[in-house]
Amino acid sequence: MTLILGIDPGSRITGYGVVRDTGRGCVYVASGCIRTGSGELHERLQIVYRGVREVIKTYEPVTMGIEKVFMARNADSALKLGQARGAAIVAGAEEALEIAEYTATQVKQAVAGTGGANKEQVMMMVMHLLKLTQKPQIDASDALAIALCHAHTRSSLIPHGLGTARSRGGRLRL
C-alpha cells in the first residue's frame, strides 16, 4: 500500500491531499489547505515550503503528484503560481519523494472521465471515489484529485512520462 500526496499549488492557498493506494483503489487519509496570508511573496513561498514539508513528515508519503502551471491571462499570477509550485517541489525533493506533474486536463480526465469537467464535477467524483460524506475545501478537493490521478497513472500500463503506446495486430507496444 502506497501513500500518495497530491498538491494543488497556489501563492495564497495550496491544497494538499493524501490517499492510500491499496492496489484495488484509493482510500482517503487526509486533506487540507496551507494558507499563506497576505505577506510578501518570499514569506508566502516559505510558508508553502514549510507547510508541504510538515505534511510530508506527518503522513510519510512515498510519491507526490503536483499540478503543472497553466498559461494564465495575467503573467504575474502565472509566475507566482510557478514559484509556489517550485517551493512545493523542493519540499518533496528534499524528502526524496518520487514527483510527477500533471496538467489540469489530465487530472480531470483521470478523475471525472472528461478533460472538460468543472470543479464541482471533479469534487463530486473525488467524494464518490474516496467515499467522503462531506465536501472538502475546493483546493483540498483539487489536491485529492491530483493524488487520484497520480495513483491511476502509476498503476496504468503506460507509466507517466514514458511516451505513447502503439497497437499493431492487437498487441500493445510501448
Swiss-Prot record:
Binding positions (Mg(2+) 2): E67
InterPro entries referenced in this protein's UniProt entry, alphabetically: RNaseH-like_sf, RNaseH_sf, X-over_junc_endoDNase_Mg_BS, X-over_junc_endoDNase_RuvC
Subcellular location: Cytoplasm
Catalysed reactions listed for this entry: Endonucleolytic cleavage at a junction such as a reciprocal single-stranded crossover between two homologous DNA duplexes (Holliday junction)
Keywords assigned by UniProt, alphabetized: Cytoplasm, DNA damage, DNA recombination, DNA repair, DNA-binding, Endonuclease, Hydrolase, Magnesium, Metal-binding, Nuclease
Keyword field contains Nuclease: yes
Binding site for Mg(2+) 1: D8, D139
Class in the EC hierarchy, top level: hydrolase
GO biological process annotation, one example: DNA recombination
Pfam families xref list: RuvC (PF02075)
TM region positions: none
UniProt EC number: 3.1.21.10
GO cellular component, one term: Holliday junction resolvase complex
Reported cofactor(s): Mg(2+)
Positions of the catalytic residues: D8, E67, D139
Cofactor note: Binds 2 Mg(2+) ion per subunit.
One term of GO molecular function: DNA binding
Protein function: The RuvA-RuvB-RuvC complex processes Holliday junction (HJ) DNA during genetic recombination and DNA repair. Endonuclease that resolves HJ intermediates. Cleaves cruciform DNA by making single-stranded nicks across the HJ at symmetrical positions within the homologous arms, yielding a 5'-phosphate and a 3'-hydroxyl group; requires a central core of homology in the junction. The consensus cleavage sequence is 5'-(A/T)TT(C/G)-3'. Cleavage occurs on the 3'-side of the TT dinucleotide at the point of strand exchange.
Annotated family: Belongs to the RuvC family.
Subunit-level organization: Homodimer which binds Holliday junction (HJ) DNA. The HJ becomes 2-fold symmetrical on binding to RuvC with unstacked arms; it has a different conformation from HJ DNA in complex with RuvA. In the full resolvosome a probable DNA-RuvA(4)-RuvB(12)-RuvC(2) complex forms which resolves the HJ.
Name of the protein: Crossover junction endodeoxyribonuclease RuvC
Organism phylogeny: Bacteria, Pseudomonadati, Pseudomonadota, Gammaproteobacteria, Pseudomonadales
